[in-house]
Protein backbone atom coordinates (compact mmCIF):
# COMPACT_ATOMS: atom_id res chain seq x y z
CA UNK A 1 0.00 0.00 0.00
CA UNK A 2 1.48 3.34 -1.00
CA UNK A 3 1.55 6.25 1.43
CA UNK A 4 -0.82 8.16 -0.84
CA UNK A 5 -3.37 5.32 -0.98
CA UNK A 6 -3.17 4.85 2.78
CA UNK A 7 -3.77 8.54 3.41
CA UNK A 8 -6.72 8.55 1.01
CA UNK A 9 -8.49 5.64 2.68
CA UNK A 10 -7.61 6.33 6.32
CA UNK A 11 -7.30 10.13 6.25
CA UNK A 12 -9.33 12.62 8.26
CA UNK A 13 -12.96 13.12 7.32
CA UNK A 14 -13.57 9.68 5.83
CA UNK A 15 -12.29 7.49 3.02
CA UNK A 16 -11.51 8.85 -0.43
CA UNK A 17 -10.97 6.82 -3.59
CA UNK A 18 -7.19 6.28 -3.76
CA UNK A 19 -7.07 6.94 -7.51
CA UNK A 20 -9.67 9.63 -8.16
CA UNK A 21 -9.68 11.35 -4.77
CA UNK A 22 -13.49 11.19 -4.70
CA UNK A 23 -14.94 11.25 -1.19
CA UNK A 24 -16.57 7.85 -0.60
CA UNK A 25 -17.88 8.40 2.94
CA UNK A 26 -17.87 11.14 5.55
CA UNK A 27 -16.84 9.82 8.94
CA UNK A 28 -14.96 10.92 12.04
CA UNK A 29 -13.74 7.37 12.61
CA UNK A 30 -11.25 6.19 9.96
CA UNK A 31 -11.56 2.53 10.90
CA UNK A 32 -10.59 -0.09 13.44
CA UNK A 33 -7.23 -1.65 14.25
CA UNK A 34 -6.84 -5.36 14.93
CA UNK A 35 -3.63 -6.45 16.64
CA UNK A 36 -3.07 -10.16 16.02
CA UNK A 37 -0.19 -11.30 18.20
CA UNK A 38 1.53 -14.67 18.21
CA UNK A 39 1.84 -16.61 21.45
CA UNK A 40 5.25 -16.06 23.04
CA UNK A 41 6.19 -19.68 22.36
CA UNK A 42 5.61 -19.10 18.64
CA UNK A 43 7.82 -16.01 18.82
CA UNK A 44 10.63 -18.18 20.20
CA UNK A 45 10.67 -20.18 16.97
CA UNK A 46 12.18 -17.13 15.31
CA UNK A 47 14.88 -16.97 17.97
CA UNK A 48 16.00 -20.58 17.45
CA UNK A 49 16.28 -20.36 13.67
CA UNK A 50 12.77 -21.43 12.67
CA UNK A 51 11.49 -18.07 11.49
CA UNK A 52 9.87 -19.60 8.41
CA UNK A 53 7.68 -21.83 10.57
CA UNK A 54 6.91 -18.88 12.83
CA UNK A 55 5.67 -16.81 9.90
CA UNK A 56 3.62 -19.70 8.50
CA UNK A 57 1.86 -20.09 11.85
CA UNK A 58 1.28 -16.34 12.10
CA UNK A 59 -0.03 -16.20 8.54
CA UNK A 60 -2.59 -18.86 9.43
CA UNK A 61 -3.90 -16.81 12.36
CA UNK A 62 -4.05 -13.55 10.44
CA UNK A 63 -5.69 -15.12 7.40
CA UNK A 64 -8.33 -17.03 9.42
CA UNK A 65 -9.16 -14.02 11.61
CA UNK A 66 -9.56 -11.68 8.65
CA UNK A 67 -11.45 -14.29 6.60
CA UNK A 68 -14.05 -14.67 9.35
CA UNK A 69 -14.61 -10.91 9.58
CA UNK A 70 -14.63 -10.74 5.78
CA UNK A 71 -17.51 -13.24 5.67
CA UNK A 72 -19.46 -11.36 8.32
CA UNK A 73 -18.94 -8.10 6.43
CA UNK A 74 -19.90 -9.57 3.07
CA UNK A 75 -23.11 -11.02 4.48
CA UNK A 76 -24.35 -7.92 6.25
CA UNK A 77 -21.67 -5.35 6.95
CA UNK A 78 -23.65 -2.45 5.53
CA UNK A 79 -26.81 -0.71 6.67
CA UNK A 80 -29.45 0.68 4.33
CA UNK A 81 -32.12 3.28 5.08
CA UNK A 82 -33.58 4.63 8.31
CA UNK A 83 -34.35 1.10 9.45
CA UNK A 84 -30.63 0.27 9.14
CA UNK A 85 -31.38 -2.94 7.26
CA UNK A 86 -28.32 -5.25 7.17
CA UNK A 87 -27.02 -5.24 3.60
CA UNK A 88 -24.47 -7.34 1.73
CA UNK A 89 -21.18 -5.66 0.81
CA UNK A 90 -18.10 -6.47 -1.24
CA UNK A 91 -16.16 -7.10 1.97
CA UNK A 92 -13.37 -5.53 3.97
CA UNK A 93 -11.00 -2.79 2.89
CA UNK A 94 -7.85 -3.22 4.97
CA UNK A 95 -4.08 -2.91 5.18
CA UNK A 96 -1.74 -5.23 7.08
CA UNK A 97 1.76 -4.82 8.45
CA UNK A 98 3.85 -7.14 10.64
CA UNK A 99 6.13 -6.01 13.46
CA UNK A 100 8.83 -8.23 14.94
CA UNK A 101 9.32 -7.01 18.50
CA UNK A 102 7.61 -5.43 21.48
CA UNK A 103 8.34 -1.85 22.51
CA UNK A 104 10.90 -3.28 24.95
CA UNK A 105 12.71 -5.08 22.12
CA UNK A 106 11.58 -8.61 23.03
CA UNK A 107 10.65 -11.14 20.33
CA UNK A 108 6.96 -10.37 19.87
CA UNK A 109 5.85 -10.75 16.24
CA UNK A 110 2.39 -9.32 15.65
CA UNK A 111 0.22 -8.06 12.83
CA UNK A 112 -1.51 -4.69 12.72
CA UNK A 113 -4.58 -5.04 10.51
CA UNK A 114 -6.15 -1.64 9.82
CA UNK A 115 -9.75 -2.06 8.65
CA UNK A 116 -11.14 0.99 6.89
CA UNK A 117 -14.52 2.40 7.86
CA UNK A 118 -15.92 2.04 4.36
CA UNK A 119 -17.76 -0.73 2.49
CA UNK A 120 -19.08 -1.06 -1.04
CA UNK A 121 -22.81 -1.79 -0.91
CA UNK A 122 -24.13 -4.61 -3.10
CA UNK A 123 -27.77 -3.54 -2.92
CA UNK A 124 -29.46 -2.45 -6.14
CA UNK A 125 -28.54 1.20 -5.63
CA UNK A 126 -24.91 0.34 -4.87
CA UNK A 127 -22.52 3.01 -3.61
CA UNK A 128 -20.19 3.28 -0.65
CA UNK A 129 -21.11 3.72 3.01
CA UNK A 130 -19.46 3.72 6.40
CA UNK A 131 -19.16 0.19 7.77
CA UNK A 132 -21.20 -1.21 10.64
CA UNK A 133 -18.25 -1.23 13.03
CA UNK A 134 -20.42 -2.54 15.88
CA UNK A 135 -20.75 -5.76 13.89
CA UNK A 136 -16.98 -6.21 13.92
CA UNK A 137 -16.82 -5.65 17.66
CA UNK A 138 -19.62 -8.15 18.25
CA UNK A 139 -17.73 -10.83 16.31
CA UNK A 140 -14.22 -10.01 17.51
CA UNK A 141 -14.01 -12.75 20.15
CA UNK A 142 -15.24 -15.37 17.68
CA UNK A 143 -12.74 -14.15 15.09
CA UNK A 144 -9.94 -14.38 17.67
CA UNK A 145 -10.81 -17.97 18.61
CA UNK A 146 -11.07 -19.04 14.98
CA UNK A 147 -7.67 -17.50 14.32
CA UNK A 148 -6.13 -19.33 17.27
CA UNK A 149 -7.64 -22.64 16.17
CA UNK A 150 -6.17 -22.12 12.71
CA UNK A 151 -2.70 -21.50 14.13
CA UNK A 152 -2.89 -24.59 16.33
CA UNK A 153 -3.80 -26.67 13.28
CA UNK A 154 -0.94 -25.16 11.28
CA UNK A 155 1.57 -25.79 14.06
CA UNK A 156 0.56 -29.45 14.25
CA UNK A 157 0.83 -29.71 10.45
CA UNK A 158 4.40 -28.43 10.75
CA UNK A 159 5.22 -31.15 13.28
CA UNK A 160 5.04 -29.26 16.58
CA UNK A 161 3.42 -30.54 19.74
CA UNK A 162 0.98 -28.13 21.34
CA UNK A 163 -0.55 -27.69 24.78
CA UNK A 164 -3.43 -25.63 26.15
CA UNK A 165 -2.52 -22.32 27.80
CA UNK A 166 -5.16 -20.75 30.03
CA UNK A 167 -2.83 -17.93 31.11
CA UNK A 168 -2.16 -16.69 34.66
CA UNK A 169 -5.83 -15.85 35.29
CA UNK A 170 -7.22 -18.98 33.64
CA UNK A 171 -9.16 -17.11 30.94
CA UNK A 172 -6.68 -16.82 28.07
CA UNK A 173 -8.12 -19.66 25.98
CA UNK A 174 -4.90 -20.02 23.99
CA UNK A 175 -2.37 -22.71 23.14
CA UNK A 176 1.42 -22.91 23.13
CA UNK A 177 4.26 -24.80 21.52
CA UNK A 178 5.06 -27.73 23.82
CA UNK A 179 8.58 -27.96 25.19
CA UNK A 180 9.36 -24.23 25.38
CA UNK A 181 9.61 -23.51 29.10
CA UNK A 182 8.10 -20.65 31.05
CA UNK A 183 11.56 -19.46 32.07
CA UNK A 184 12.38 -18.78 28.41
CA UNK A 185 9.12 -16.92 27.85
CA UNK A 186 9.69 -14.82 30.99
CA UNK A 187 13.22 -13.95 29.84
CA UNK A 188 11.76 -12.40 26.70
CA UNK A 189 8.80 -10.69 28.40
CA UNK A 190 10.34 -7.43 29.59
CA UNK A 191 7.37 -5.38 28.37
CA UNK A 192 4.91 -7.54 30.32
CA UNK A 193 7.11 -7.22 33.40
CA UNK A 194 7.15 -3.43 33.02
CA UNK A 195 3.35 -3.33 32.83
CA UNK A 196 2.97 -5.61 35.85
CA UNK A 197 5.39 -3.47 37.88
CA UNK A 198 3.55 -0.27 36.94
CA UNK A 199 0.19 -1.76 37.90
CA UNK A 200 1.50 -3.11 41.20
CA UNK A 201 2.98 0.32 41.99
CA UNK A 202 -0.58 1.62 41.88
CA UNK A 203 -1.64 -0.96 44.44
CA UNK A 204 -3.57 -3.23 42.06
CA UNK A 205 -2.77 -6.32 40.01
CA UNK A 206 -3.14 -7.59 36.44
Model-predicted segments: where are they?
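Intrinsically disordered, flexible peripheral segments
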Residues: 1-206
Amino acid sequence: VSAEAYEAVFGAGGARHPETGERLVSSRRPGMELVISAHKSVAELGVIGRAEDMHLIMDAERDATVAYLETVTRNGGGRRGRAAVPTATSGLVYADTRHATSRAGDPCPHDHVLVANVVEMLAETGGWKAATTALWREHLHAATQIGRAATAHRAVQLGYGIAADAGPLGRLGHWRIAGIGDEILELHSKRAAEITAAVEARGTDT
